[in-house]
Amino acid sequence: NQNHDQIGNRAAGDRLAATLDDEGLVIAAALTLLGPFTPMLFMGEEFAASTPWQFFTSHPEPELGKATAEGRIAEFAEHGWDESAVPDPQDPTTFTNSKLDWADVSSERGAAILRAYRVLIALRRTDQAFVDHRYEANAVRFSEDHRWLVLTRGLLGPDVTPVHVVVNFADDAAEVPVPDAVGEELYGFGATEVDAGVVRFRGRGVVVLR
């Protein structure tokens, strides 16, 4: 998942929203929010913030500020980044560029991603399958060749029906077998279809079902 450290220490401070499409963002959100670990959300990711989170500083000592900027340029040059692509951490615009643009919330993309986050958070809070975090209560199946994954939660509860988080990472169509599912779709994003024991994808997407 995203956080200030992982994003800020990228050369340009670009978020996942800068490179992933909506399906990719919701897949990442589903695995973060419905996984067995305590999720952490990074400010703005819930509405696909378009602003970066760049590394910025306000050192009062000019020599320290200069050394910080030169150090970052040298660090990323080793990984093939051009100097012009690495913002100066002492430049005030590096800070202002990192502020959230609240207009993103009501944009078409932002609103769609926010709806997805709200549904996923509600599922985590209300469905008993997501309560048990013990190792044995969870299972994962995947196909490396076909690039799909099934995360199953709630395997140990006597009065809990397991929930399956089914993901297709590939751009290609996929049929993912979920033989233990009862077929109740709780959420879906992307071009998907749920049939008896099978989830069909026409591209990347995620389905949550019992």
Language-model regions, residue ranges each:
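Short secondary-structure junctions
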Residues: 135-142, 182-185, 191-193
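Ser/Thr- (and often Asn-) enriched beta-sheet segments in non-cytosolic proteins
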Residues: 152, 175-177, 198-200
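Surface-exposed beta-strand edges and flanking loops
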Residues: 142, 152-153, 178-180, 188, ...
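C-terminal beta-strand-rich structural cap/linker in extracellular carbohydrate-active enzymes
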Residues: 195-210
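Beta-strand-rich binding/interaction modules
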Residues: 163, 172-191
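A residue-level detector for conformationally permissive "hinge/kink" positions
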Residues: 36, 189, 196-197
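Loop/helix patches that line or flank the sugar-binding groove of alpha-linked glycan CAZymes
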Residues: 1-163, 169-174
